[in-house]
């Protein structure tokens, strides 16, 4: 069982005079987040303890139980991420997912929060077993893969797995910026231009690697 750090403080309940909370909010606003996002994702922070000096982004499963959290430095003085010693074989933000409509897969939590709609961050470049099984056993037909440009080979590898299971796969061609840098509107434009992956285009992509 995973729990939030005992020092966790929800951002939305922070007083307007809290210097630390205001610094964190400024950092998150700069990344395109809003007060509504703070509530939606229950974003918080720690000022002390193992995760002191970090923004905490929790994830909840389909039953709204905590299944993981990401701890991100907001002041540049630490390693960027310090995650809990818990299994990553989970579906991040699962409580927000509708398994009957197209799903977007991206790398990180900030990418997911920028994309906003029916998106799952895979926390890196590899697909968890739980997520893979959930997708292939549900009615979702279309999968959009939006990994960073340096992970094109991984995107194709993931796409091929779903293609072999009869899913429709679209590769979102990102520029040098990742979704969290692009923002919602720019990313939406890119997803509308996403190319469907088939055996022929898969082979062509592989030749380009």
Task: Pin down the residues of each PLM region.
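Short, surface-exposed amphipathic charged segments that create phosphate/polyanion-binding patches used
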Residues: 55, 136-140, 180-193
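Acidic beta-strand-to-loop metal/phosphate-binding motif
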Residues: 105, 141-154
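TOPRIM metal-binding catalytic domain and adjacent DNA-binding surface shared by DnaG-type primases
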Residues: 1-56, 60-63, 97-98, 133, ...
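A residue-level signal for conserved active-site and pocket-lining positions in enzyme catalytic cores
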Residues: 28, 64, 145, 179
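Phosphate-handling DNA/RNA-contact segment within nucleic-acid enzymes
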Residues: 48-142
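Short, aromatic/basic amphipathic alpha-helical patches
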Residues: 154-166
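A generic structural motif
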Residues: 169-178
């Amino acid at each position: 069982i995973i729990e939030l750090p005992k020092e966790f403080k929800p951002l939305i309940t922070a007083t307007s005079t809290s210097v630390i909370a205001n610094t964190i909010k400024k950092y998150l606003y700069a990344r395109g987040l809003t007060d509504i996002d703070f509530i939606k994702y229950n974003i918080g922070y720690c000022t002390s303890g193992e995760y002191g000096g970090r923004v905490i982004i929790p994830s909840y499963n389909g039953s709204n139980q905590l299944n993981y959290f990401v701890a991100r430095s907001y002041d540049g003085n630490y390693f960027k991420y310090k995650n809990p010693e818990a299994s990553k074989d989970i579906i991040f933000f699962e409580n927000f997912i509708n398994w009957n409509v197209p799903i977007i897969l991206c790398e990180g939590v900030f990418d997911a929060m920028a994309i906003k709609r029916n998106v799952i961050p895979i926390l890196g470049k590899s697909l968890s077993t739980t997520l893979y099984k959930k997708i292939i056993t549900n009615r979702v037909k279309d999968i959009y893969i939006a990994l960073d440009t340096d992970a094109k080979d991984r995107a194709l590898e993931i796409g091929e797995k779903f293609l072999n299971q009869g899913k429709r796969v679209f590769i979102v061609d990102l520029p040098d910026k990742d979704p969290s840098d692009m923002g919602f509107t720019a990313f939406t434009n890119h997803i509308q231009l996403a190319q469907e992956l088939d055996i022929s285009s898969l082979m062509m992509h592989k030749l380009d690697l």
